Regions:
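N-terminal membrane-anchoring alpha-helices
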Residues: 2-30
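Non-catalytic C-terminal accessory region of glycerolipid acyltransferases
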Residues: 3-12, 104-203
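Catalytic core of membrane glycerolipid acyltransferases/transacylases, capturing the structured
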Residues: 19, 26, 41-98
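Short gly/ser/thr-rich secondary-structure transition/capping motifs
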Residues: 26-34, 98-101
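Small-molecule pocket liners
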Residues: 29, 68, 166
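Short acidic-hydrophobic, aromatic-tinged amphipathic segments that line or gate anion-handling sites
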Residues: 33-34, 92-95, 176
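A secondary-structure boundary/capping signal
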Residues: 35, 72-73, 90, 120-121, ...
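Glycine-rich helix-loop-beta junction characteristic of Rossmann-like nucleotide cofactor-binding loops
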Residues: 36-40
């Protein structure tokens, strides 16, 4: 298993949180997980989808059978405790008010070293009535620069305590071309179509 976290202590903390947190998460929210087999067990990959809640990040850690690095807003790193914890969990700090070149470089470095990145192209939790917010170009840009496959996902339902009311579905992995505008539109449409299919199926 690729370990971009580097230090063994950080690796152990990630494993502890995953081992303890995953059963609790599944016990409390009882999620339905579809298409987990579409996430490669090793090698570079970008996992991305619609952002419905701050709890979505729990799926990024609990479901894949590997270390997954997530992009998180820099405000979470402001305190010493927050900075130590989130970096130990493999999170990459992103300043959303600028084109954060440091975050981009760190994400690309993870992928070039055969790691996994999870991100939400909308850039924030979607609290609107729109099915999806316009996608930023980070996911397709990283995929193009590092020749990493994208695994799209959708989360449907609501997070309700001790009720089987939330579902995450992972789609098939695919590679992008060089036309980032076209590929960003394709990614957005892929996720929209997955959401519409879930709605049609009543799931």
């Amino acid at each position: 298993m690729y370990n971009y976290l580097g230090e063994s202590m950080k690796y152990r903390l990630y494993k502890i949180v995953k081992c303890v947190g995953t059963p609790l998460f599944k016990l409390i929210f009882r999620p339905t997980i579809i298409g987990k087999e579409n996430i490669p067990l090793d090698g570079r990959v970008i996992i991305c989808g619609k952002h419905t809640s701050n709890l979505d990040a729990a799926f990024m850690i609990s479901v894949p059978d590997r270390i997954v690095h997530t992009l998180a807003k820099k405000e979470l790193f402001n305190s010493k405790i927050g900075n130590a914890f989130f970096r130990s969990m493999g999170c990459i700090s992103v300043n959303r008010s600028i084109h954060d070149e440091n975050a981009k470089s760190e994400a690309i470095n993870v992928l070039n070293n055969e790691g996994a990145i999870a991100l939400f192209p909308e850039g924030t939790v979607n609290k609107t009535d729109k099915i999806i917010l316009p996608f930023k170009y980070g996911a397709v840009s990283f995929a193009s620069k590092t020749h990493s496959p994208i695994v799209p996902f959708v989360i449907t339902g609501k997070y309700k305590l001790f009720r089987k009311s939330i579902t995450i579905e992972y789609g098939k992995a695919y590679y992008v071309g060089d036309d980032l505008e076209k590929e960003n539109e394709k990614l957005q449409n892929t996720i929209i179509n997955m959401l519409k299919r879930k709605e049609k199926d009543g799931k």
